Regions:
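Bacterial N-terminal signal peptides that target proteins for export
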Residues: 1-12
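Bacterial N-terminal signal peptides
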Residues: 10-20
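Expand to "…catalyze enediolate/carbanion chemistry for C-C bond making/breaking, isomerization
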Residues: 24-310
Length: 310
């Protein structure tokens, strides 16, 4: 092999490596946000199983996001950290040429109002690398504002989006390593307040008070989405089932506010409801629970994608 040929190979290799690096840095990391920006519905499941086998199964499931429920499962940060590492698909990273996870991990924390507890729990799950938080039982605008602030770092003095002032303590080493980026602090802000942000602060509306206050809640700067909890909502309204017409009316009230303000809205679904919910305007939905995709969840995922044209 001649000297010129060797130099050509080195030059081409350098160009390819540079292209991969640029692609990885420019690529949107949070797939759910990318789908929102492209007006495409997203599909996920609830996860209560922190095992490595389930992590691998979920990472290759074909879903868009994983709703890791730490409200109704143990709040165990070390198990969460190992679970996230288990979802890392190195082959996919190489094949795609970017660092975006195929399935975005999001966490619902247990705290439902206590400020100190909420801030601490949000900080801990963010510090291991999740891409967003579901905050349960949000009834008021003040709760939503606190949730957004707990998700953000304090901004630099010249930041155009300084408010709502962040409360998250800064020690991003684990999250930075998991995301695979050096500019974690710059990218770990809430979307859509920061258009380049990769974090989602999402509020669960699951009470009569939450429905009544939805217009105030939904206009909080930094709010990234609304998730309607039909079961708790029906209980809050005094009904034994989400099928009650009054509960569905409340669901449509929240959805209508989301559509009016262009805020992504989510709800739990199954085979019998996923197509209807997508047609109604829900932007992201869960289609079942984890442990691998069972037949019902797989069918719901298929029907949802067909309804969404994906």
């Amino acid at each position: 092999m001649g000297k010129v040929t060797k130099n050509m190979i080195l030059m081409v290799s350098s160009i390819l490596l540079l292209s991969l690096t640029v692609s990885a840095s420019a690529q949107r990391l949070n797939k759910l946000i990318e789908l929102f920006e492209n007006d495409q519905p997203a599909f996920g499941v609830l996860s209560f199983d922190y095992s490595l086998n389930n992590a691998r199964a979920m990472a290759s499931s074909g879903l868009d996001f994983l709703f890791i429920d730490m409200e109704h499962a143990p709040f165990d940060i070390e198990r969460l950290r190992l679970f996230l590492l288990g979802m890392t698909d190195k082959r996919s990273i190489i094949e795609k040429g970017n660092l975006q996870p195929n399935v975005v991990p999001l966490v619902r924390i247990p705290a439902a109002g206590g400020a100190e507890e909420l801030i601490a729990q949000a900080k801990q799950v963010l510090d291991v690398g999740v891409f967003g938080i579901f905050f349960p039982a949000v009834h008021t605008r003040e709760q939503a504002e606190l949730a957004v602030r707990a998700t953000r770092y304090p901004q630099y003095n010249d930041a155009p989006d300084y408010e709502p002032a962040g409360l998250r303590g800064r020690n991003p080493s684990n999250a930075m390593w998991y995301w695979g980026v050096r500019d974690y602090h710059a990218r770990a802000d809430v979307w859509p307040l920061d258009p380049q942000g990769e974090l989602l602060a999402m509020m669960f509306i699951e009470s009569r008070a939450g429905v009544e206050n939805i217009e105030e809640i939904i206009t909080v700067p930094g709010l990234g989405g609304i998730f309607i909890g039909p079961s708790d909502l029906s209980t809050s309204m005094g009904y034994t089932s989400p099928a009650a017409p009054e509960v569905e009316q409340a669901i449509q009230t929240v959805l209508g506010a989301c559509l009016e303000h262009d805020v992504p809205c989510a709800i739990t679904t199954g085979q019998g409801s996923v197509q209807q919910r997508i047609d109604q305007g829900f932007r992201f939905v869960t289609v079942g629970a984890d442990g691998g995709l069972n037949t019902g969840a797989s069918n719901a995922l298929r029907l949802g994608r067909e309804a969404a044209g994906r």
